[in-house]
Amino acid sequence: MTQLKLPDIAAQTQAYAVPLNWVGMCGIALPVQFEGRTAAAKVDAGVSLVDGSSRGIHMSRLYLALGSLEHQPLTPLAIRQLLEDFLSSHASLSSAAYLRFSFEHLLNRPALISPLAGWKSYAVTVDTRIENEVFHVELSVSVPYSSTCPCSAALARQLIQQQFQTHFSEQKIEKAAVLQWLGSAEGIVATPHSQRSTAQVQVRLNSNQQVLPITELIDRIEASLGTAVQTAVKRADEQAFALANGQNLMFCEDAARRLHQALRQIEWSKAFKLRVEHAESLHAHDAVATSQWQWDVSCAV
């Protein structure tokens, strides 16, 4: 029996020669090792196609090369070596290589007062590339928090003052009566509106960074805002959460400025951009603010 040679269509030349910026695959399932645990990641892998006369790239080479990450921690060095493998397997075809990892990062978070704890999931994206022989790593996280409107809080306080004047207008005020009134539904006639909000932060890491500081970045974001959403709670925790919201009243502009200031203190970052979104409970639309530092492109909404 004559054995036929399998055709290699990708090796054929292309009559209409046009280089392509990015060619590859999106949504590849891959287990990645991070902080001693395995995360189920979706990976986008690709290279540039600078040889416009070439029909295409060797996608199977990229896919198989990803296997090198299954049994080692996900670090900038490991990713850089993989990107260099992409380029060496596409010599004369490609000058740039790209990898994006998207996964959920689980953190066990303690309650504010009680001994309870629970898991929170944070969306994480790691964007990496080699372009012009320079390696870049950008780390993105999405962090939920609570925001209470300062204007609404002021209006609520005014209504409570008016109610106080009405209730105690014609009697001698005694401390016990005031305390009882303040603890009643009649006394606190209004509350400010608050909502679950989201901070989306993208940080460009220094070239000598040896680890992906995902947990540290999340911790800094939550600390700067002061109102991280909770997991398991008892009444004491809920009360502490109410206090935290009252002490951290925020418009979206306030949240964006807090984050900007906190991110400027990070020593392993050389650029960042951020977007905060308050899913308004008063309105049917969202309030949004963005900021950036040392970023190449304007930070659009």
From Swiss-Prot:
To which pathway does this protein belong?
Answer: Cofactor biosynthesis; 7,8-dihydroneopterin triphosphate biosynthesis; 7,8-dihydroneopterin triphosphate from GTP: step 1/1
Is Hydrolase a UniProt keyword of this protein? yes
Q: Can you tell me where the transmembrane regions are?
A: none
**One GO biological process term:** tetrahydrofolate biosynthetic process
State the UniProt keywords alphabetically.
Answer: Hydrolase
The site (May be catalytically important) lies at C149
Q: Does the keyword Hydrolase apply?
A: yes
The catalytic activity, as recorded, is: GTP + H2O = 7,8-dihydroneopterin 3'-triphosphate + formate + H(+)
Which InterPro entries does the UniProt record give?
A: GTP_cyclohydrolase_FolE2, GTP_cyclohydrolase_FolE2/MptA
What name does the UniProt record give this protein?
GTP cyclohydrolase FolE2
UniProt lineage? Bacteria, Pseudomonadati, Pseudomonadota, Gammaproteobacteria, Pseudomonadales
